[in-house]
């Protein structure tokens, strides 16, 4: 099978699993469902950056609910891509109503030399959890979700064979490490972990190729607020949830390891 054939087989397998996954696994709090709008890509986020020959894989935790008000414009554009009405999907990255995560990712990837307003052949975006909440965008995260989707993430990583995997947030990093190694790694004190510079692991994919796995803070409002906790601006004031200077320093350390656009 070609790489693309393996990829589309993976999408079909994940969909089939979610459609028949016992309700008991997702009872209590938000339930995870498959999104039928994932027709061309494995994840809604993947419509943004989706090179199967990517050098860098960006991994988030989970999308949230695609049916909520905040997702309407995004879902409309993705459906246009699926129907052939437009060729490519990009989120709104300028002007009003820019999603904080998307806007901050644009700035953070600029540290590595990438422009997220274009399709970058080095990049592939996905969430680790491939299902979608039936309501809400956060809270109620369950380790069962990680155990269920870990085999699919491993298959995805082994199709793409990235050199670098950047994980947004503690749960994502722990999930990726479990998915790729089968071992559980628990991070205590996530900010200290990032500050230490020891937030990099090297794993071997089934082909024998190594991949560097980096933990970074999620760059949404809450993740940025948590990363800035206890940090001060140059004038001594507290950093707000809109300031990503600390996260830029984290990404500069990734760049210092040679991870950047060539």
Label the model's feature ranges.
Residues 2-164, 170-184, 211-212, 216-231:
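A polyanion-binding, active-site-adjacent surface
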Residues 183-262:
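A hydrophobic alpha-helix/topogenic segment detector
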